[in-house]
Amino acid sequence: MSEQDSWTALDSDYRLNHAIRIILVGAESTRTTTLAEALVTHYRAMFPGIRNVEEYGRQFTYDLLEQAATDAAAAGEPEPGMDDLVWTPEHFAIIAREQTALEDAAALAAPLVVADTDALATLLWERRYLDGTSGSELYAGALLPRRDLYLVTDHVGVPFEADEIRDGEHLRADMTRWFTEILGARGYSWVLVTGSREKRLADAIALIEPLLEGVPEASLKVRQPGDQ
């Protein structure tokens, strides 16, 4: 039996509760996705089933912007931009719920999860865009899966790279502070990763390696010739 089969043969509740979950969060354009993808690539030889847990909110924003453009065109109005989008608590509830679903699917597939953001980060983005009742708090609190480590990507020394939905260069320092404050307040283990891409990757691997001692031995064995 291969190491991948040994993990997926385990009970689903066991996998959800025992997968090592590494969550990457950070302000806009702080190389969070870059680091997440590099970690997945690094660990794929050990865990062939490891998945890229991408940022659901980004695709949701593109879809919302596309729908707003369609509605504006039908009404004969100018094409809207990010500042024209109308966000609701329900939007953030959907984003938080779907982000957790992606994370859990990755936990069922492999004993190591590397997630590019999570429902707790969604809560902070909701704080940025909305005041009042939160739609994502339930998913960021009571329904948030167990975490092993948060990696917060620092904004310092990272140039801001704009795209059609990034609009928060002026808020990056505040967002970094919000992340570290809420992680500390809620008692999560977290580390601020800084420096070059290479340094961030090396530091992240050094932090993750000791956590892998908790992975079932059968899931860590090296694939041998003839394994089925």
Q: Where are the model-predicted features located?
A:
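C-terminal accessory extensions appended to soluble enzyme cores
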Residues: 2-9, 214-228
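Hydrophobic "anchor" residues on beta-strands that sit immediately upstream
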Residues: 50-51, 112-114, 150
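Conserved substrate/cofactor phosphate-moiety recognition/catalytic segment
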Residues: 40-98
